[in-house]
Design a protein with these regions (language model features):
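Residues at the starts of beta-strands that form the adenosine-phosphate
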Residues: 1, 32-34, 122-124, 156-157
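Short, histidine-centered active-site or binding-site loop motifs used for metal coordination
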Residues: 6-8, 128-131, 164-167
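Glycine-rich phosphate/pyrophosphate-binding loop and the adjoining helix
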Residues: 136, 143-190
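N-terminal beta1-alpha1-beta2 submodule of the flavodoxin-like/Rossmannoid cofactor-binding fold
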Residues: 1-105, 109, 168, 172-190
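Hydrophobic residues at beta-strand termini and immediately following loops
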Residues: 36, 127, 161-163
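Structured loop/turn residues at beta-strand edges in well-structured enzyme cores
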Residues: 73, 91, 119-122, 156
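Short, structurally constrained coil/turn elements
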Residues: 27-29, 120, 154
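Short, glycine-/small-residue-rich phosphate/pyrophosphate-handling segment
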Residues: 108-152
Length: 190
């Protein structure tokens, strides 16, 4: 199953347009897919003391986090859509990682103490937007996140597409990026 993780609060944003283009492409293809809309779901990204007490057991007291874990356990391809804020993912996406990618669920340790991924996600694709040039964030999104977060939990095959200079973009540039997003999503589901 393909899962889309969406992390933007404003329904008139370009991120919303990216989400809509991707969901329209997925709907045409028909196979099973799922949307995790973090803001619409009311997801709380903060890890509270009761959740932290369960963390080492790979459990959560957050019903939404558990729902997301159930979805990810059936996911073999994942698409993220979010803006780049302060050079990284928004807090709600970081909180998704903190609260959902738990030890025992998404990763564990080998008897020798090595990190062992547990998820079976073959493709991970990110669509982001930014005001600054893509090169500004390249090291984080092409190296750190794929190698130290995604690979650690079993999210493989990471690809990143960033639409930069968002305030100065033309309608033609936006339309081209939406087509790219729809094409990528359709190719993933086939």
């Amino acid at each position: 199953m393909l899962t889309v993780v969406y992390g933007h609060p404003y329904d008139k944003s370009f991120n919303a347009a990216i989400k809509d283009a991707i969901l329209a492409a997925l709907a045409k293809e028909g196979p099973e897919w799922s949307l995790i809309d973090l803001y619409a779901d009311g997801f709380d990204p903060a890890v509270r003391a009761p959740e932290l007490a369960l963390y080492s057991q790979g459990r959560t007291s957050d019903a939404l986090a558990q729902k997301y874990m159930d979805i990810l356990s059936r996911t073999d391809k994942i698409i993220y859509i979010f803006p780049v804020w302060w050079g990284t993912e928004p807090a709600i996406v970081k909180g998704f990682h903190d609260k959902v990618l738990l030890k025992g669920f998404a990763w564990t340790y080998s008897p020798e103490g090595r990190l062992m991924p547990k998820l079976k996600i073959r493709r991970t694709v990110l669509f982001t937007t930014s005001e600054a040039p893509t090169a500004t964030f390249s090291a984080y999104f092409t190296h750190y996140l794929p190698e130290h977060v995604f690979a650690a939990v079993g999210m493989q095959g990471a690809a990143w597409h960033n639409f930069d200079h968002i305030p100065r973009s033309t309608p033609e540039e936006r339309a081209a990026f939406l087509k790219l997003a729809a094409r990528e999503a359709a190719a993933l589901i086939k």
